């Protein structure tokens, strides 16, 4: 397997527990853009997962998805950052097992997982690395299992948003991107590795940014927009993939 090469940004510069503490569940959270963005993504991904599914959450960060959404405590989270894995183990250790990437062996999990989730990773790794991990995911999935993958939909609007976030966001990701996918490019990458795309949908509209001003109403507008256009337009690509 190729050794995953990622910058020091992911290992040490992202604060411990950053993504988990950015996701809020109180009344004020309806007006928090970042929190709403992540919760909409997690909810969309979780709609593909059954309560008894054993899940591998690859690039799990600080463990929020397993800790807040996945029901089966036999699930596993893996990440390249020791800081995030330590945080996840401390906070969500009762909801799953968490491993630093160098301590996780794919070979021990042949045909093991009902679902594998990989959320927001592929844009930060090379296509060679992506293809290598797709092969590993295929090995670890049960015969009827599914890989659920998300990545930004890098069309004009998303590129503009990323530019703005690089200037005004809490973290600047602009130097971390290695590949910018659209749905066609992602589809071809997946098929190239002997996997099959069951479904591609695009989630999260620009209405999400209005949540700062109109809170819950913005989330309703985002939901209506998705239904109206059957999730054919959105800032995030969500792919359901099988062997």
Language-model segments: residues:
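Short catalytic micro-motifs in class I SAM-dependent methyltransferases
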Residues: 120-124
């Amino acid at each position: 397997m190729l050794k995953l090469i990622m910058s020091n940004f992911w290992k040490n510069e992202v604060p411990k527990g950053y993504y988990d503490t950015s996701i809020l569940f109180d009344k004020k959270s309806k007006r928090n853009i970042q929190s709403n963005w992540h919760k909409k993504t997690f909810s969309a991904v979780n709609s593909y997962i059954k309560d008894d599914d054993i899940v591998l959450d690859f690039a799990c960060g600080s463990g929020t998805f397993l800790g807040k959404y996945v029901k089966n405590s036999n699930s596993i989270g893996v990440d390249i950052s020791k800081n995030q894995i330590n945080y996840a183990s401390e906070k969500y250790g009762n909801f799953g097992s968490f491993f630093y990437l160098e301590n996780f062996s794919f070979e021990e999990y042949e045909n093991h997982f009902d679902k594998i989730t990989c959320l927001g990773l592929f844009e930060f790794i090379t296509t060679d690395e992506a293809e290598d991990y797709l092969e590993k995911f295929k090995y670890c999935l049960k015969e009827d299992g599914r890989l659920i993958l998300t990545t930004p939909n890098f069309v004009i609007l998303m590129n503009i948003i990323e530019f703005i976030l690089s200037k005004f966001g809490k973290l600047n990701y602009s130097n971390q991107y290695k590949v910018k996918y659209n749905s066609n490019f992602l589809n071809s990458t997946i098929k190239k590795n002997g996997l099959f795309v069951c479904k591609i949908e695009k989630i999260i509209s620009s209405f999400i940014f209005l949540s700062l001003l109109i809170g819950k109403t913005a989330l309703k507008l985002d939901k209506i927009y998705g239904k109206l256009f059957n999730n054919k337009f959105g800032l995030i690509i969500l792919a359901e993939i099988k062997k």
